[in-house]
Every structure is written in C-alpha cells, then in structure tokens.
Amino acid sequence: MFIVHRRFFQNEKAFTPAGKHEKVADGNKHETLATSEYPKVCASNDLYKILQISAPKVGNFTIHDAPVVGLIDSILEYYLYISVKVRKAWIAGYGSQPQNLICFDWERFTGILDQQSLNSPPLAGFVKPDPTSAEPGFLLLWPASGDLFYWERTSLMNVEVSAPEFPGFLHYRIQLKRYESCKNLVSAEPAGFFLTLSSGRLLHLNLKDSDGNSSIQVRILFPGLHIPNCLLSLYNSIFAFTSGRVIPIRCGSIKGPGERLVYSMHSGSTLRIWEIFGTGDHHLLRGFDIYDIILDSIQESFSYVNRFLILDFSVSTSDPYTLACLVSWRDNASLFNYAAIIISFNHQMIPHVSQFCHVRSYLSAILPSVCRIFLPSPGTVVFCVFDVTFAMFHKVRGKEGTFYVEENLVVNNLTSKSRVLDFGMEDAIYEKSTHTLLKTPALILLTEGHGIIRIESSASYLKTSFSATTYLRSRLSQFASQSPLFREQFLLNFDFTYNLSESEVYNTVFNLCDELYTTPCKKNMSVLETLHSQQRDLMEIVLVAFKYLHLSPSNRLQLWLKVAYCSALADLYELLMCNEKMSNLLRRVLKIMSSNDNIDELFLKKCLNINLLLQHLSSEYSQISGQDASNAQKRIEVIVNVNNVYGTIFGNELAYRQEKISKFTDPSSVIRSDLWTVEVDHLDLLRKQIEDSISLHRDVRDSKDAHILKVSNKLRKQILHLVEQNCLLIFDLHNGTDDTIVKSHNFQKFEEEFGNSRKEWLQYLASVGYLEKAIDLAEKVKDFQTMVILLDCLDPKDPTIKLQKQKACLNKYKEEFADVIFFYLVDTEQYASLLHDFLEYQSLLISFFEANDLLNLLWIFEAQNGNYGRASEILFRDCEPEENRIIGKISQLALAKLYSWTNRIEGENIILSNETEVIENHLAILLIQEQYAEMLSSLVDITEDEGEAVEAIVTSNCVNLSENSIRAWLVSSAVERLIQNEYTTLCEMVDFFSSFSLRECSFKEVDLALELLERATITKDVYFYLKDLVYRRFLLQVNWAEIIDAHEDLESSFFPMVKEIMLESDFLIWLQHMEHNIHDESKHYLKSEKNFLQSVYSSLSESQVEDYQMELFREKQIFSVLCKDRELYILIPKLLDVATKQ
C-alpha cells in the first residue's frame, strides 16, 4: 500500500498555508507509460517522482520461480534474484536485455557444499570492477559453512567448471568457530567487503593482493566477545534476534582509489569512524558515544522520554560530516514512536543534532522486523523504512524559512507481485568508473514482480516557496497521473491533509480550480478548444479531490457547480460559433454585457454574468413577440434559440446537482452554490419561458406550414427538457437543508404557485405524446397527485401496465403514495379496483379506511378476506352495546347471511364485479345493511327477551357458518324454548342441525335434533315425519365411500363414527322400515303426503305445499338411488356385526 501523509515541521510549530501560486502539473505528461521504454514514470508530484527503471521480468525469469532473496547495488546498477526452491540466481543490470541475463545454478557445487548449505539462501555482493571494465564481479557466501565463491566478472558464472578453481574464479572457506555463522556481508567497494559474524566478530575481506591480482584475503577488524563455544549457540540466537534491527556497518565517502570511510555502531550508541584501504589496512579516526545528544534532542519535544533505541543509522557517500539515525521510544500508551535524527560534525569532528524529525505517520505496538534509514543527500531528503511503510522527509523552503514535510508511502503487500525484496540508496554525487556524476537522490526498491522502482526526490521545492496550495496541487496532480503499475504496487491514503482544517482544504482546492479555468489561451488554440481544455482539467482536479479529500456536502456541490459553470460557458460559446441564427441573437445580448465588445473575454476570464444574460434574453423575446405577434415563424425561431440558452444554462446546473453529485453524496443534504445564485426571479423567468413556449406551441402545432411544423416539433422537445429542468431544480432546492433561498418567503410563495403550473405542464406533455416521461418526472419530484391522474391516461386495453406502476410506487414510497392513490380511487368511485387490486397491501388499506372513517368500505374489505368477526364489529359498531353478548352473535350471523347472499347473485362476487355494475350492487349492499341494522336496533330494546333474540338468529338460517362456539350456544335452553313455536321454525332447525352433522361427521347432532323434537309439544305423526326427514338428510350427507373403506380398517378415523351410527337401534329399525317404502312412488303416497303437509303447514298456500312436496319427493328418489348403488342393505348389517364384536 502507498500512503501519502502531509506533515510540516518548522521548529515544531504549526505551518500556516500561504497564498495560491504555481500551475498544476499536466496530468498527460506521463503518456510515455504506455511505451516499452524505461524508465517509466508511475506517479509524480513536486517533492518526488516514482519510476520503474527495469522490466518486471528478465529473460526466462518469472515470478513463478518464487524468489525469496533479492539484492540491489544502486552504485553498480545491478540486481539479483535468488530462489532457494530451484537453487538458482538471476543477475541483471538495470538496462539489461533478455539475452544478457545471467542464470546461475549452484547445484554444480554439490561436491563442495553440504546439503544444509544447498537448501539455504547465500549472502551475495557485487564487486566494483577495474576502471577498464564495466562488468562487475560477484560474491556468493554460504553462511553456515563459510564457503565463499568469487567471480571476477558475472559473465564467468555461466562457465561450467570441473575443477574447484579456474581463471577468473576463486573459492575460499572462511574458518568459522563451532556454532558460529555469517550474518551480514556489507560492500565497502573499492575497499573490499565487511563480514559480521554471529559471535560479534567483524572481518574485512580484500579481493586483491598487493600486486593487484585477484586473491581472497581475510583480516579480523574487531575480535568481538570471547565467548566459549559451549555458549556460542545461545549467543547466536540472541544475536539473530537483534541483527535484523541494527545494522552495525555503514560505508561512507570514497576517499580515493581503494580507500573508503566506514562507520560502525557498537554497544548500541558508540559510533566509530574507520579509514579502510583496499590493501587490508585500516585506521580508526574517531570514536564517541552519541546517546546523550540524541536523548537531549528527543526530550525537547517529549520530556517523558528517558531511554530510547538506535535502530539504524546511515551516512551519505557525498558528505562524510553528516549522518542520520533512526531512533525509537515508548510513549505513555506503550506504543513505539520513531524519529529521524540528523547529526552533523563540526570542523573538530564533534557531533551535534542538527535536525529532529518525528515520524508522525507511523506508530506500532511492537518493533517492526525491518527498520532502515537512508540519507542520500544531506539537507534535502531522508528515507525511513518500517517493514512495508516508508516515511520521507523533504526539506522545503517556506515564507518563514526551511522546514521538513513528511510523507508516508506504504507498499501494497497483498500480492506476491508487490513484495519488496531489498532497498538501496542513490546519492546525489555518484562516482562511476573515473567519472563523478551529479544525480538526483533516491530510494531504490527491488520488487518481486515489478523490477526496480525508484523513488526519486525532487530539488524543485528548494527553489520556490512551498505552501499548502503547492502541496495540495502536487498531490492531486500525482493522484491523477498514477499508472496501473503504481496502483498495483502501492495504495494511497486519502487522509494526507488531516492536520488542515476543512475550510483550508476546500479553499485551497477552490483556488486551484480558479487557477485552472482562468489559464490564458495557449498558442494555436481557439477559444472553444481552450474552454474545453479548461473544462477537462477542472473536471479531473475535482474528481480527484472528491476521491482523496474529506469535503463537506456543500463544498462538494460548490465544486461541482464550478464545473457546471465552466461547462455551460463552453456550450454557450459552441452555440455562438455553430448556429448562425443563434449567433445573431446571442451576440447582440453579449455585446450589451461586454464593456469593450470583446465577447471572448467574457468566456476566457469567466466573468459572464449568467443571471444578467437570462434577463436580457427574456427581454429580447418579449420585445420581438410584441412587435411581430402575427409572425408565427419568426416568433417560433426566436423562442427556440432562447430556449437553447436556457436549456444549456439550467441543464448544466441541474446535471451537476442531480446526476454527477449523486455518486458522491445525497443531493438532499447539500446546499446551493454562490457561483451563480438561483434566485426566485430567475426561476420565474424559466417558468415564464415554459408558459410562453407552451402557448406558442398550442398555436402552431396544427399549422399546415411544413417548416413551422418541423420547428414546432423541436419546440415540443424543448418544452419537455425545460419542464424537466425546472421541476427537478426546484425539487433539489426545496430539499436543501441549509439553503437560504428555501427559507425565504418568496420561495415558499413561488413553490405554491409552481405546484399548479407543474400539474398543467405535465398534463400538456401527456397530451403531446410524452405521457410516460411526464409520469416519470412526476415520480422524480414526488408529485403523486398529478402522477395518479396521468396513470389513468395509460392504455385502458391493458390495465396491468397502470396497476404495475401503482404497485411499484406503493412498494417504494409506502404511506406517502398510498394515501394519494387510495383517495383518488375513492373520489373517482373505483371501488372494485380499490378492494380487489391491492389485496397484498392490507395494512395500508385498513389504515387508510380507519384514518378517513370509510367504514362502509372497511367492513366489505374485511368480509371478502374472511375476517367475518372483524367485519361484523365494523358493520354494527354504532348499534352494539359492549355488554350485550346476544347482539354480538346476532351481528356475526347477520353479516354472514348478508355476505352469503351477495355472493349468490348470478354466481358472481358482487364486490369483485366489473365497474358497470359496481354502483348498483353497492346500493343493494347498503340496502341490506340498513335492513339488518334496523332488525338489530329493534332487538336492542328487547335484549331481556332471550327467546326472540334466538328466534331471530335461527330465522336468519345462516347454514354457511361453522363456528363451534355459535353451534354450542344455539343448543341451549333458549333453543329448547324455541321448540314451542311454529312448525316452520322446526323445519329450519332440522336443516340447521343436518348441516352441522355433516361438518362434524357425528351422529350426535342428529340425535340432539331428534331429542329436541321429541320434547316438543307436537303430534306423534308430525314427530315421526320430521324424524324421517332428519334421518334421510343425514344419510344423504354422509360420505359413504369413506365408510365402506373404513369397515375393514379398524384403525380408520371413520370407524368410531360408523360404530356410533350402527349401534343406534332406532336407526336400524328406521332403515328396515324405509326399505319397504323407499320405492313407493304411487300417487297414493304423494296424496297422503300432501294432506299431511297441509295439516302441518296450515299457513302455506296450496302451490307452496306442492313445491315443498316435490322437493321432498326428489330427495327420496336420490336416497333410493344411493341405497341401490352403495348396497346399503347389505353393508349396514355387516357394519353392525363388526361394531358389535368390537
């Protein structure tokens, strides 16, 4: 990950941003990234540039070979990959071609190296060549065995050898103690190499003898501690833990041929400076302890610190009098803090701290495994490395002097392709062969999948004054110019400006935008090309700012509208250049607005007053329309041109308010811009322009002139766009939480008037072919009242389209849309649609009915959904006493009777009938409702007469009701008293109990009915007649197919019922009696039955008696067929026998 943080240090004081200056770097200057040439620029800003200086793979080497070790020599510009897995090493120079790749396989030394060495990575180093040779030599050292291989030239590594040595190749085995191993191999070329051992010994390796010939000579520079061999293993483990954190050897300036300064750190803080010669000689120049001076420097800023660690130090090859130390200490939260300490030496070589740079961008709970510091050029830049995090300190010049800016770079180590294998440093002064070159100080990274990456410090920041504007501009330019390789290798942190206030960040970006779109016209570029170029640059900087900066919603909108203004100017200028008729009108207006008739200056200097332009255009059209009222062709041409300008201006404003800004923030949470203030007067101008356009379009849309019709069609499209812009812009302004225009009285009054205008506009759009667009626009601005009206205009042949849109809005807007659509259906008496089409929105419908006291619709809705109890409570809400239980039951039965009756009309559900019948059927329902209400209201006065109440219930004959509670309540003492009444009631009681006997599959219901009849004060003939009727109806209702199957299956659920019926002796006797009379269809039987019926039902007319007689006769015929088909006379004795045995 690559993170950039911004830090300013100047005597530990806060940095105050300066004014705006300097131009933004061109984001297109890195187009060479697409080429195959190296180096490739990955990203850049004012402080540094990041480049890829070698190919990601060389020759046949690929990332799949899993290198685990890397080495880079930034002086000789060579690098090395080592893979233990395949026991190979790949060597290449920065600019090497694939054919020059050197691949070395160390398995050829299996006779020399033991198995442990073959399976472990070697230490390596490049050797500085002779002045006459550009090709370096190479060292490989196996730490455990001490075997050292030296090739005078890297090209010799491909030579197959059979002998231990051959010309140009040397093998030497360093004498190691038991349990001793090699730890670090440090290049001090041209003065040889330094080798640190796990025992603490420091060796100097010289690769030439006194005559200049190749020879390996080893001298002990520091004997280390005298540790017995028995304790050396324990010491090795301790040293291994610390050696990765403290590198004790650093090589400094090259003094001459074969001479170099070397710095070593002993005992944690004792610095020794050596003069080393290629002949193997050495001389100690100075030695001193730097602990106290560093502690004093830390305590100036952090007084609580009393101890610290020196993790690493670095010296520059160009300046022997300056070194940098990376130190660490714990704070009160037990976190490790880090700082870069710059130490300088005076002419007497006495050290003092010249700069303290606290690393504010990195804290850690534990010390990282890799801690490095690099000082490539004193007084310009310092690099610090913490595992995968790099902290860079750049020295810059501000108004109050020089100070350091800290930036934080983090390597993206999520993939193996981005892993960093080694670090190198490139000094400002670079010696190559016999030449001394001046180079840019840089940090070099050897990556696993992207080759060599160079972080190059820039010197430009020391030439000009550095400020917050400069810094922000360079960062935004850097982000905009990132290459794909940079994004893969690094990640960027957006929070690099967290120590600046929001207003400072926004003001700086706003100033950058001003600089961008007021840049002067370049040579050979037209005004229009300049405007489009400025628009692109402005868009780029705003998009990058939105991505990486923390800006408030209002600041985001202000930046967007700055782009909108620039975009509108570009579009207006294009209209001015490309449309001759438009040009005449627009030029005339623009010349009035320009003091020196220089129209281009209005656009280039961004001083065109949009509000004034709209007023002038409105006045121009009014004047022309008044002068040539009868000239329809001229009026329509002028209004089309004026509409083009209105559409360009308001369209750009709206586009950046509504569309593009929605990607970054909620438009309802932003406020308007002060760039060009949208006042009520200007909205009113737009409204007047729309009304004038609609009025003119009405006059000319039926014209027979072909040209006028063509322009009229264009005007129709313009009306659509202008209405859309006006509606959406006002909707956006209305939702601005902090917008002063919304809070003004004028805007509120305007919005009320606009609501009526909007309805008329949308309906006009629907009438001229834009019905669907008008519906969508009404939905966008949440004008649901107009929307439901427009939905009714959809194709009536396919009502599903309208219903789908209505349901989609109900799902999206819930109650907000439900109240509008339901009220509309009620007002237009679309009851069938209201009660049938929206059944899945039951909760919304019920809430709507209840809230608006629409009980006449609510009880029907509940009833058709089967909620009879709830529906009855609603239907009789006004006439039901709370404590009257009888009236409650009556109301339930009455509702059931009513609902059953309405469903039997011609087999249709009255509530679901088509629209032509709904009014008539609704009146019928209300009539029945009034009748039952009158009946129940009369019962209120006689609630103490329980008999009359029960009689009313039974008279209602609600045989379709099956509640157990109602049935049990009917079989009560009240029902017994009912038996004393007319015979008509008794027949209805038989019907009632027969229906329940079927549902309950129980003969108890029949038995109960017969018991009540027997207790009644009726003649014996009447009793036997009714008993015969009860038995026969029961047998007709029993599912005999189930009973026939059950007589052999004793576990069947029907068997208890069969047993119960068969054990009834009266039933068997009656069945045998019926066997003799079942086929009696003679006129004598009919005549006797008729006489009997006339005696029982004396109140019936003769025709009514005959009808009832024929109904009973058909019932007997059905019973006869049933007995024959099912062989009941054979089956019943069998069942009786089975039941008796059981």
Curated annotation (Swiss-Prot):
GO BP = poly(A)+ mRNA export from nucleus; protein import into nucleus; transcription-dependent tethering of RNA polymerase II gene DNA at nuclear periphery
Q: Which domain of life is it from?
A: Eukaryota
* Gene3D superfamilies, A to Z: 1.20.58.1380, YVTN repeat-like/Quinoprotein amine dehydrogenase
The record ties this protein, via InterPro entries, to: Nucleoporin_Nup133/Nup155_N, Nup133-like, WD40/YVTN_repeat-like_dom_sf
- Listed GO CC annotations: cell division site; cytoplasm; cytosol; nuclear envelope; nuclear pore; nuclear pore outer ring
Q: Which GO terms describe its molecular function?
A: structural constituent of nuclear pore
Major location category of this protein: nucleus
Keywords (A to Z) from UniProt: Nucleus, Transport
Q: How does it assemble?
A: Component of the npc107-120 complex which consists of nup85, nup107, nup120, nup131, nup132 and seh1. Interacts with nup107.
| Biological role | Functions as a component of the nuclear pore complex (NPC). NPC components, collectively referred to as nucleoporins (NUPs), can play the role of both NPC structural components and of docking or interaction partners for transiently associated nuclear transport factors. Active directional transport is assured by both, a Phe-Gly (FG) repeat affinity gradient for these transport factors across the NPC and a transport cofactor concentration gradient across the nuclear envelope.
Q: Which family does it belong to?
A: Belongs to the nucleoporin Nup133 family.
| UniProt name for this protein | Nucleoporin nup131
Q: Which organism is it from?
A: Schizosaccharomyces pombe (strain 972 / ATCC 24843) (Fission yeast)
Lineage at the top is: Eukaryota, Fungi, Dikarya, Ascomycota, Taphrinomycotina
